Amino acid sequence: MKNLIITLGITGCGKSSWLKDKHPVVETDDLRIELLGNIDDITQEGFIFKTASKRLAELFDSYDTVYFGATMVDSNHRISFLQSVKDMCVYSFVIDVVVFPSDPKVSIARIKKDLKDGILRANSLQYIDQQYKQF
């Protein structure tokens, strides 16, 4: 049985850090860089998530476990995204959700520190409160 492991938590809660030693991983931030040239470009989320669905489905050809990194805090988008992966995939798979504790103050501090230190990450400070309410 195949296994899709997805992250769930607000921006800055540690999802990408947790995924660093996992393989293979599809992350929306990485796709924004690759496809749009800008980690902060959220103007084409449909395109980004459709590409993510396709890549995840394709990775199951070679791997039994595949990881997906994104906030996924909005349940309406989460369900439709997971359905799109299922629709594209020829394999049956189980979905495991890794829920990250979310503290807006901690996330804000982490993001500010990363940006100050020149770490490539989305400047998503303006979305934390909205994500936390959805979480």
Predicted regions and their residues:
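Conserved GTP-binding G-domain of TRAFAC-class P-loop NTPases and closely related GTPase folds
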Residues: 1-8, 13, 17, 23-24, ...
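Compositionally biased low-complexity segments enriched in polar/charged residues
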Residues: 4, 47, 60-61, 88-89, ...
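Short His-Asn-centered micro-motif
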Residues: 8-9, 68-71
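Conserved substrate/cofactor phosphate-moiety recognition/catalytic segment
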Residues: 16-66, 73
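ATP-dependent NMP and nucleoside kinases share a basic, alpha-helical "lid"
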Residues: 34, 73-119
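Amphipathic alpha-helical transducer elements in NTP-driven molecular machines
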Residues: 45-53, 75, 101, 125-132
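Surface-exposed alpha-helical segments enriched in charged/polar residues
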Residues: 54-57, 61, 79, 83-86, ...
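Short glycine-rich, basic-tinged beta-strand/loop micro-motifs
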Residues: 66-68, 113
